[in-house]
């Protein structure tokens, strides 16, 4: 079973994403901000991270930059899932090492399609 870390400061978004991904046979961990997510990645080493951009403590972009700079941590597939939909944000995400970018709100078909595209399904 593959594992996914859902990183979002919204409990509702985490709950919806968890339901979808558990339906696709993913084992789920959750974090409310980038700092918690780094800690989870160091311990659990997930196969993928579904990542929000705007969060307290540490943003999704800051998390991704720090994660990609950690050679001793398994490097998961990272899919941004955010309301930030302008090209500048998308470009920054890709440059930092994101594998895919999804706009909120999302549904199960979009999420499944993106996970297929990046080789998780």
Name every feature range the model reports, one short phrase each.
Residues 11-29, 118:
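Two-component/phosphorelay signaling modules centered on CheY-like receiver
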Residues 30-48:
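Acidic, metal-coordinating helix/loop segments flanking the phosphotransfer/catalytic sites
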Residues 31-35, 90, 108:
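Conserved Asp/Asn-Gly motif in the active-site loop of CheY-like receiver
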Residues 55:
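Receiver (REC) domain active-site loop signature in two-component systems and cognate sites
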Residues 106-115:
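C-terminal output helix
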């Amino acid at each position: 079973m593959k594992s996914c870390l859902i990183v979002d400061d919204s409990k509702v978004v985490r709950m919806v994403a968890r339901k979808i991904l558990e339906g696709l046979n993913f084992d789920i961990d959750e974090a409310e901000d980038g700092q918690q997510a780094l800690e989870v990645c160091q311990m659990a080493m997930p196969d993928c991270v579904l990542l929000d951009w705007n969060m307290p403590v540490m943003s999704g972009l800051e998390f991704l930059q720090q994660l990609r700079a950690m050679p001793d941590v398994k490097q998961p597939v990272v899919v941004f899932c955010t309301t930030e939909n302008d090209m500048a944000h998308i470009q920054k995400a890709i440059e930092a090492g994101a594998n895919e970018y999804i706009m909120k709100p999302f549904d199960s078909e979009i999420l499944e399609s993106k996970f297929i595209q990046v080789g998780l399904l």
